[in-house]
């Protein structure tokens, strides 16, 4: 997963190659200054023991302070640079992810679950951000500091440096060996987080029904079961991560014990000076910090790789319905539809089979039938929510699959069974997709949908914010708002999928009459359980499950 995830990240890093080179330079300067500080301190101690003037001692002190300031400046510059890279990469990736998810069909959405996709689009991006910002900065600085530090130690005492190097190499090898297990554990944690998000989203959406059936305790118990699995996964990840993150500190302390003993013997025998001995001790302290930072960066690498793998899995999914390479746009649409031996399979069975229809432009087709007979599927074919498995559907003589999706969907309005409104004003919901619509068009659509009488009851009329999914409106008001939104587009194709099921019979009759007297050259496909809603249609078909 990590390798796949990191390969997926590479294209997003290419625009920042120059920044990465500059960041490497910043890290090299900062690491070099940090690594040279113990050397300067050791020389100052040796000079002090040999007897130097206060002016020389002050020069050493100024040099150490100057190195510390240099480290701070270049670490700051590196952190700012990597933060900017993280922001840019996260922005591009989140845009791509959102665009990809909007193109998913219902089958793909059901496969992942909305909650899981929300988890990938939110919490996974936190780990991508941490990888690019803190993880990259920490790992680059720590690796350079370890390399430069070991090189400077080797110039002072190769045997002591070899001990430190071998122990650090052992630590890194153990981290990489245990890393895949940590990543798999983290991936399982993220999967369970997706399950929690899905469970929460589903039950909050149905909160009123849960309360109406008195199932609050059962829902809490069910959430507890899901949460328990998440907690156990999280504990497993924490234990594995703790083992990996504690290795560098343990190794450096072991190296310190060996250097203290062996280095002391070297001082006594005169192989190294007291200043060089102190220099080694300080180096171990510096390398300990670098090793701890490297462990933290390695953890971010594991988490970022797993998160990138989960996001990449979604981005690699191609939509089931997409533009053909040679797709064309229609400059004008009359609205003549034709179904030719159309068949659609759902889970191995025919939802529609051998359907042939000819719907003249400007006519109305009424569609009735039992639940599960394929009425919604039929409308979905016109909107290209999905494509037929057999036969073809054509608009004005053009196979729908040969048309650009944008061109097709610009010419139609689709009101599905489940009314979906956004948490914005009623007017913004009605003008969704047609910004800047004149007031006359808005009020005409409101009148046709018989929504005018409801406006005085709303606190701010058309400016009233309807809440998430239109929660502040009744079911009938939501459906009529959706119809007004469809009419505001002035489409050539109007698809109504049982769009009046929550509207009372008299108001529904008024809306049907309004649509029947509509003089716009519009082709209408109306699905309804009420025969009264389709009795004036030019054609009526009955679908049998």
Q: What residues fall within each predicted segment?
A:
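Membrane-integrated ABC transporters
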Residues: 1-35, 49-64, 78-82, 86, ...
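Short intracellular "coupling" helices and adjacent cytoplasmic loop segments at the cytosolic face
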Residues: 87, 95-119, 123-127, 198-222, ...
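An intracellular "coupling" helix at the cytosolic face of ABC transporter transmembrane type-1 domains
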Residues: 10, 17, 106-107, 123-132, ...
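Transmembrane helices of ABC transporter permease
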Residues: 15, 19-32, 134-188, 259-273, ...
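Hydrophobic alpha-helical segments in the permease module
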Residues: 63-75, 168-172, 241-255, 274-299
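Cytosolic ends of transmembrane helices, especially the final helix of ABC transmembrane type-1 domains
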Residues: 215, 239, 286-314
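ABC-type nucleotide-binding domain
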Residues: 330-545
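Cytoplasmic juxtamembrane "membrane-exit" helices immediately C-terminal to transmembrane segments
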Residues: 80-84, 88, 92, 155, ...
């Amino acid at each position: 997963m990590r390798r796949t995830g990191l390969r997926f990240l590479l294209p997003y890093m290419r625009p920042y190659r120059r920044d990465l080179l500059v960041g490497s330079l910043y890290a090299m300067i900062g690491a070099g200054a940090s690594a040279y500080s113990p050397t300067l301190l050791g020389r100052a101690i040796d000079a002090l023991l040999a007897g130097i003037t206060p002016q020389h001692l002050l020069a050493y002190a100024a040099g150490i302070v100057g190195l510390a300031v240099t480290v701070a400046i270049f670490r700051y510059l590196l952190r700012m640079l990597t933060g900017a890279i993280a922001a840019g990469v996260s922005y591009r990736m989140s845009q791509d992810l959102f665009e990809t998810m909007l193109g998913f069909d219902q089958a793909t959405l059901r496969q992942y679950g909305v909650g899981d996709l929300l988890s990938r689009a939110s919490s996974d991006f936190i780990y991508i951000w941490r990888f690019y910002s803190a993880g990259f900065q920490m790992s680059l600085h720590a690796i350079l500091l370890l390399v430069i530090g070991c090189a400077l130690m080797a110039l002072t005492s190769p045997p002591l440096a070899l001990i430190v190097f071998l122990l650090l190499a052992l630590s890194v090898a153990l981290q990489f060996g245990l890393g895949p297990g940590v990543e798999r554990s983290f991936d399982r944690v993220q999967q369970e987080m997706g399950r929690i998000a899905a469970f929460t989203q589903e039950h909050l959406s149905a909160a009123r029904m849960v309360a109406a059936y008195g199932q609050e305790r059962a829902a809490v118990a069910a959430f507890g079961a899901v949460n328990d699995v998440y907690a156990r996964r999280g504990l497993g990840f924490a234990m594995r991560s703790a083992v990996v993150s504690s290795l560098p500190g343990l190794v450096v302390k072991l190296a310190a014990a060996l250097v203290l003993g062996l280095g002391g013997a070297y001082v006594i025998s005169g192989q190294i000076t007291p200043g060089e001995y102190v220099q080694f001790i300080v180096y171990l302290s510096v390398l300990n910090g670098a090793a701890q930072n490297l462990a933290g960066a390695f953890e971010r690498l594991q988490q970022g790789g797993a998160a990138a793998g989960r996001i990449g899995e979604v981005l690699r999914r191609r939509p089931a319905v997409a533009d053909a390479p040679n797709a064309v746009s229609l400059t004008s649409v009359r609205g003549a539809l034709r179904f030719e031996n159309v068949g659609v399979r759902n889970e191995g069975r025919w939802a529609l089979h051998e359907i042939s229809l000819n719907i003249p432009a400007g006519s109305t087709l009424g569609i009735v039938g039992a639940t599960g007979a394929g009425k919604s599927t039929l409308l979905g074919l016109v909107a290209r929510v999905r494509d037929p498995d057999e036969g073809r559907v054509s608009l004005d003589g053009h196979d729908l699959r040969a048309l650009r999706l944008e061109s097709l969907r610009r010419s139609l309005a689709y009101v599905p069974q489940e009314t979906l409104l956004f948490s914005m004003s009623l007017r913004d919901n009605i003008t969704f997709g047609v910004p800047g619509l004149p007031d006359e068009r808005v009020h005409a659509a409101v009148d046709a949908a018989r929504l005018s009488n409801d406006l005085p009851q709303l606190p701010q009329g058309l400016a009233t914010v309807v809440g998430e999914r239109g929660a502040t409106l009744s079911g009938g008001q939501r459906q009529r708002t959706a119809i007004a939104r469809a009419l505001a587009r002035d489409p050539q194709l109007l698809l109504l999928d049982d769009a009046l099921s929550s509207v009372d019979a008299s108001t529904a009759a008024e809306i049907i009459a309004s649509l029947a007297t509509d003089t716009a050259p519009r082709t209408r496909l109306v699905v309804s359980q009420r025969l009264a809603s389709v009795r004036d249609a030019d054609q009526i078909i009955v679908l049998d499950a």
